[in-house]
Every structure is written in structure tokens, then in C-alpha cells.
Amino acid sequence: MFERLEAVEERYEKLNQLLMDPEVINDPKKLRDYSKEQSDLSETVQTYREYKSVRKQLDEAKAMLEEKLDPEMREMVKEEIDELEQKEEELVNKLKILLLPKDPNDEKNVIMEIRAAAGGEEAALFAGDLYRMYTRYAESQGWKTEVIEASPTGLGGYKEIIFTIIGKGAYSKLKYENGAHRVQRVPETESGGRIHTSTATVACLPEMEEIEVEINEKDIRVDTFASSGPGGQSVNTTMSAVRLTHIPTGIVVTCQDEKSQIKNKEKAMKVLRARIYDKYQQEARAEYDQTRKQAVGTGDRSERIRTYNFPQNRVTDHRIGLTIQKLDQVLDGNLDEIIEALILDDQSKKLEQANNEL
């Protein structure tokens, strides 16, 4: 591990020199690439330097114990050693996590798709609750949201809603939301007070750039039509709505949120790129999991990942066994406690796997 850390620090210093090179300064692409690489390495290098400082202090403190000290001073040195050893252990654990392979998509924007599943109108209302939960969470992080396509119902729910979340690191936090979300509550229309169970599915995809996903224009069929509102009524007499069909994969994307056909096509292409990338990633993951004989984890959208129980004001994430009695706060966008627990669990599993492969 420490050989890798030395190599990382050496590369960091090299990048510092390169970023002062006039040739690099005058080359926007190199400047951007080197700056990003330096930024990515910065936390690891600073933590490693802190570790080396603590290690040096620890060696000096232990050397002091070899000298003749009065009892009071010896006790003070022992206390300092205990504190430094605890700090050293914390820094080593942090460095192990920092050296784990990074998800190349973590810094990307997100395309999120929420669909009502089992439960009829109740499922559609729950899909609306989830949409509001994620938009409020995005606001708390300083991110922007933009609707791409929506199929609202008469009571304020959604059969389906697709939207982007724009902000640095959005995917790193929201990628754990993939899967089936279950709600348990008494519908307003239920006179007997019985609890109903409904579900909605969430797909969280990283937004991909054109250069990252090659799509041959010959493989896309473009259909245009007049956009429609709730209930199917026409709201636009121009052919502004766009449907894109990727013939090789059969993936279909529709967008009619904008008045302009050009803007609708741009939005639809963003979703299409993300879905094609996700399809290939899922196929690669499935092959990898089959090889390692592992069960499909959080990427399996048919898996029930979380339950929202209204009568008990309870949220349970079934993947990590986390239960919190703050449903009202969670639906208001306070997702930090759940997301941080999921990130920690993911890091722990990766650390265990890395240790097993040593």
C-alpha cells in the first residue's frame, strides 16, 4: 500500500510541475486533464502526508520513553502515544478507502427515471412523492433539476417521470437508489383504514457525453408528433414531440416537454445515450457476477431495496438493514443519513474484497 502511496505522491508533484509548464498552460485540453488528475489525487496525497507526520511524531514519542523521565512526564508521553496510535489507525483506514478503485462516473450528472409499478393510482402518487423527495435532496446539495419527460395523472401522481439532476458528484450519491421502492400507507380513498402496499421503480443513470457513447445516426429512427398533455389532449399543434428508437437495442425514448422539436431531440438523445450505456454496463456486470457466482446486488431493478411505512413513520433500507423513524424528513429530501450509510457499506465491501485478493 505504501509503495502505491509513494507513487501517487510522486505523480502529484509531477503534475504540479506540468501545470506550471507554458506548453501545458497554452493547451486547454492538457490543462483541463492535468488539473482534474491533480484534483483527484489531492485528498490522497494530503492524507498520506498527514499520516507520515503522525508516524514521525509517534517514533519521536516512543524514543522519548527510552530516556530517563520523571513519572509525570512519562505518563504524558504515554498518553500522547495512545492518541497518535489512534490517529495513525484512522489515517491508515482512510488511505485504504482512498486507494479503492474510483467509479469513473461518480462526478457525472444524473438521469433519473421513476415509474409507478404495482398499485395503480397509489403507485403513481408514490412516484410523485419520490420525485419530490429527490428534487428536494438535489436542492439541499445545490444541484439543479430539469424535467425531460413526464406522464402525470389526474390526482397529482406520475405514471412515469424522467428528469436530470445537474451537479458535481450527483451520481456518486444517487447511484444507490436503483431498484424497487415500496410504500405502505392508508389511501385517502380507503374508508376501512386498511394499509395498502404499492411500488415504484427508480433507475439512476449517469449522463454520458457523445464521445463516451458512440451512436451511429443510421441506427436511430426519429419520429415526430404533436405533443399531448394529461389525458391525451393535444396541447401543441406543431410536430414538436420526438420519439427516438435505437434499432440495435430496441431502446425507445420520447420527449415532448419542450415547445421546440430541436430541444426535445437534444433531451431525448441525452436519455438515449445514458440508457444505451446502462444496458452495456448491466450486461458486463451480469457476466462478471456470473463468473464470480455472486448474487445480483443493488443494480438489479427488480430487487425491493427500501420500504416507506407511513403509519409507523419508518423507512427501512433492506440492503443494509437500516431502519430510521424519520419518514416525514426523508420524503422532505433529508437523505444524507441513508446515503452515507450506503456509501460506507459499499466501501466496506470493496475493502474486504481488496483484502481477500491480496
Swiss-Prot record:
Matches recorded under Pfam families: PCRF, RF-1
N5-methylglutamine carried by residues: Q233
Provenance organism: Geobacillus sp. (strain WCH70)
Protein name, UniProt field: Peptide chain release factor 1
Molecular-function GO terms, alphabetical: translation release factor activity, codon specific
Superkingdom per UniProt: Bacteria
Family (UniProt): Belongs to the prokaryotic/mitochondrial release factor family.
UniProt xrefs under PANTHER family: LD18447P
GO cellular component: cytoplasm
